[in-house]
Amino acid sequence: MRVLHVCSELYPILKTGGLADVTAALPPALASFGVDSRVLVPGFPAFINAIKDKQLLINIPSRFGAEEINIFLAKVPNTKIDIYVIDAPSLFARPGNPYADSSNQAYADNYLRFALLGWIAARISEGLDAKWKPEIVHSHDWHAGLVPAYIKASELASGKKAVKTVFTVHNLAYQGLFPMSVFAELDLPGIFLSMNGLEFYGQVSFMKAGLYFADKITTVSPTYAKEIQTYEQGCGLEGLLADRHNDLYGVLNGVDPQIWNPKKDSLIATNYSSTTVATGKAKCKLALQQMMGLAEKEDALLFGIVTRLTEQKGLNLLVEAIGEITSRGGQVVLLGSGDKALEEVFLAAAKKYPKSIAVQIGYDEEQAHRIIAGSDVIMVPSRFEPCGLTQLYGLTYGTLPLVHKVGGLADTVTDSSLENLADGTATGFVFDEFSVESLTLAIRRAFALYNRKTDWKKVRKTAMQQQVTWDSSAEKIYQIYKNLVRENN
């Protein structure tokens, strides 16, 4: 089975969030089911610079404002995965963030940049590469939302049955919304600009295009699949998603054990397993405390946070609750960037309590590994969270997740309540209500369990035994593919 994945990010070449981890890990995981995956990406500088031994597949005349378009075929470095890169310098050759300028303003021509991505995907589905034609095209998030629309448009124009499409929602809150006037530049049938198409409250929505035109929709956890059909979490698209509930699947993301594995992680102070976790984490914790200038206290309960500093991620709650940690002798290490006001608040807290709070603004993949390995608790207090990968990394490293009961967090972490401790299912700390009070109670439960060393070790062992790799999830995705291919034959 041949599957083309269409996305804007791919770890380790380009990453701004969890999307890159998923698009990198899913194709190799699917290979064990006989799926021949290839990936199509925009020619951002990171991709152009990373790929070696590329071959020119085709040159395409000017389109979507791009003066020159070359499609290259290469290998994703250090993998067996083939990658198509759209080299269109006038659209993609921009430094820094792939979506926004140095002032963090979204590029005004993003609709053209990602229209080209979708249009090229449709051409590949028709046989642009004479040696490889996909049976399924699987697009990811709003950047690739037009892929199913262009494929459907091609089917309508030719009268021939097109390849089947799958669209994955990684985060419904980011929708790719543009003024209605841009539709004329997208080269799509006029009938697509309607409620039964791209139109969304007087705007054009790339996300809605994917949701409406894809044959099947997946999102990244069972709970999130239910939540996005509700007014509270549907971001205005709950009606469409509810109408398509029979085509909507919630499939948890997984962890790539080649990258996130305490037994062989070269980025952490020492490797460890579930049997050596006590000594291994103690060494990682000391190394982290030394690196971040914290007091070197083995018995201090250390909370790690690796996140974007936004309201969605619950950081406004943490601002109010952080005193609960320091007043009890705990420590906090935070890595992230985002809202400038939140950055300043956390930097001020670190300046006031330099031996208890350490803050690093920005994102550093290596440091993320060190924080997750060296912390006792990893905090993910998100207001909403489609899946979340950080808590899965925490489970893998024996770093107990403290999470809000929402989305994929609710699906993957079991609270250390008395009954869950009794039956051996507890893996972390879960708070139900998105409030400072509820978060504070969860923090207090973490301290209480930490003081009961035998119980803490049991929960940590249970956490590390959780099956959070891609094996099970990849099989579910494969079954969706298989059913679609069967429909097309």
Swiss-Prot record:
Keywords assigned by UniProt, alphabetized: Glycogen biosynthesis, Glycosyltransferase, Transferase
GO cellular component: cytosol
Catalytic activity, reaction form: [(1->4)-alpha-D-glucosyl](n) + ADP-alpha-D-glucose = [(1->4)-alpha-D-glucosyl](n+1) + ADP + H(+)
Pfam families: Glyco_transf_5, Glycos_transf_1
Pathway(s): Glycan biosynthesis; glycogen biosynthesis
E.C. numbers: 2.4.1.21
GO function terms (MF aspect): alpha-1,4-glucan glucosyltransferase (ADP-glucose donor) activity; alpha-1,4-glucan glucosyltransferase (UDP-glucose donor) activity
Binding site for ADP-alpha-D-glucose: 15
Gene3D superfamilies, per the entry: Glycogen Phosphorylase B
Entries under InterPro entries matching the protein: Glyco_trans_1 (IPR001296), GS/SS (IPR011835), Starch_synth_cat_dom (IPR013534)
One BP annotation, GO: glycogen biosynthetic process
Family per similarity comment: Belongs to the glycosyltransferase 1 family. Bacterial/plant glycogen synthase subfamily.
Main function: Synthesizes alpha-1,4-glucan chains using ADP-glucose.
Annotated protein name in UniProt: Glycogen synthase
Organism: Francisella tularensis subsp. novicida (strain U112)
The encoding gene: glgA
